[in-house]
Amino acid sequence: MSAKEKFTSISPAEFFKRNPELAGFSNPARAMYQALRELVENALDATDVHEILPSIKVIIERTSQEKEIYRLTVEDNGIGIPPHVVPDAFGRVLYSSKYVLRQTRGMYGLGVKAAVLYSQMYQDKPIEITTAPLNSKRIYSFKLKIDVTKNEPIIYERGSVNNDTGYHGTSVSMYILGDWMRAKSRVYEYIKRTYIITPYAEFYFKDPEGNVVLYPRLTNKMPVPPKEVKPHPYGVDIELLKNMISRQKEDTTVKEFLVKEFQSVGEKTALSVIEMAGLDPDKRVQKLTDDQLSKLVDAMKNFPDFRPPSPEALSTIGADLIELGLKQTFNPEYVGAVTRRPKAYQGHPFIVEVGLAYGGDIQPSEEPTVLRYANKIPLIYDEKSDVVWKVVEEIDWKRYGIEDEQLPLVVMVHLCSTKVPYKSAGKESIADVEEIEKEIRNGIMEASRSLKTFMTEKRKEEEARKRLLTYLKYIPELARSLSIFVTDGKKELAPKVQEEIQNKMIDLVVTKLNIKDKDLELFKSYRVETL
């Protein structure tokens, strides 16, 4: 090693400023989409997680003609942010309210801060935040940047005004270098896919070209919000254990620690785990050596009688809301959805939901349209590297009654978990975890069985329709023969009588057999000329 070689450390902010692609900010188009996504997800977490019907306003404005600098504004009606938290929430990387065992859209305390770092790289204006917590008598405003070297906020302005209207929520504006023409389709697709699974929300979206799109609220029914839960013993490691122990009182025993800090652990279970680890249950937990901690972790991971992790930390969308969103967006001939039972991997609970839509306004293609979601986040990029796509590709749709080479089919998959195994900090694709892959496959197969029943009934109806129309071909001939009989061969009267008989028979058949308009038009084409 050279004697002149120097070693140094950098802050988390400096690291992500140097490597923005790790957080999804790899180019102006992707960065524009990613920044908008981070702001919208924070807005939704501030509303539906707290049982507030979301009203989200999204505005993108171009502010410079020389460079493609855009002002992104996202406003919500959520719980707001306490003013003393705002600087760190937007100006300190890896600072977050989401480091708890509860399902949230965000995970790392990174997203919006990565957007702020990207914003600072190409223009000088700070991020602007206006917020009012629930029942706050003041509305607070901030302008700030991130000190990259120190990983702390630089506050340029702060202030407050009276809140005379009872307003609560948050508005965030940031300026970024973007590429609207390349990002446009992704941004619109993101908002559409978000709306599919949040039909209880209303969105106002205005793009840089002045186009305004309104997404109305379709229902007031909301998913049950997640609850914060204790860690499960199967998900523990030595570092997590040390961190938890550091927050205990000095006289806390090993048994008390296990019972108080972990789910699925009562006194009897705690004593069994401690016995497996060869420890004294009355020993102070802060006095455990590294070797003893290692034995305790091994015992916790290998104890066979823990209950599965609690699903209370999860919030599913629900089959009803999935079906409502798919119907509104695709106007399908068939729609169905299932919510699977909770499962677990590495001590973390997860639930898979699957929705299928077929026919109607769905455009046929060689492959199904796949909508991927994780913790209610639409995943737009990196589709083919996702485990969901891998499973969908392996499904033989002919087994479920879809014989066409061109598939008018939408497959929607939602994974919710306290720990989604993303492949990167950009949160765009789910890793191939065996337990999750198996459950996604089972979920699609379960949903597809209902689709198969529909396709079977549809095929029977089509075959019955063909037989019926074959029989209906003879009605005009029958009407003509009857008209000759009724008029006693008087040709001048026969045409009128034939028309009357034929119309009455049509009305009778249409009423009794519930023939649809398209079939009626086909039937009318079988009429023969009157005498």
Curated annotation (Swiss-Prot):
Enzyme class: isomerase
Native species: Metallosphaera sedula (strain ATCC 51363 / DSM 5348 / JCM 9185 / NBRC 15509 / TH2)
Subunit note: Homodimer. Heterotetramer of two Top6A and two Top6B chains.
HAMAP family in alphabetical order: Top6B
SMART domains: HATPase_c
Sequence similarity: Belongs to the TOP6B family.
Residues that hold ATP according to the record: 42, 76, 97-98, 106-113, 427
Catalytic activity: ATP-dependent breakage, passage and rejoining of double-stranded DNA
Gene Ontology molecular function: any one: DNA topoisomerase type II (double strand cut, ATP-hydrolyzing) activity
Physiological role: Relaxes both positive and negative superturns and exhibits a strong decatenase activity.
Protein name: Type 2 DNA topoisomerase 6 subunit B
